Amino acid sequence: MDKVTSLDKFRIPIGNQEIELQEFVFEAGGMPLLRTRIRERSRFTIFDIDPATAAHWGKVLCAWAETQPGGSGGKEEAV
């Protein structure tokens, strides 16, 4: 059976979307993926990201956050 481990779950203050990040490991083997689940009311958007894409995306998110008022680049916990 495939293994899904929840890494974090939080709500976005504006829009109230729920974000859940999960590690998804296939029973058959292969590369683990980062599953991103975005919930808006009853609608879900789910996509899987490979490690290289996750690293690139994370760097861009942190760089942007550091340029914004109150941004910490992911150095403080989400509320």
Stretch-by-stretch model annotation:
Residues 1-79:
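Positively charged, low-complexity terminal tracts
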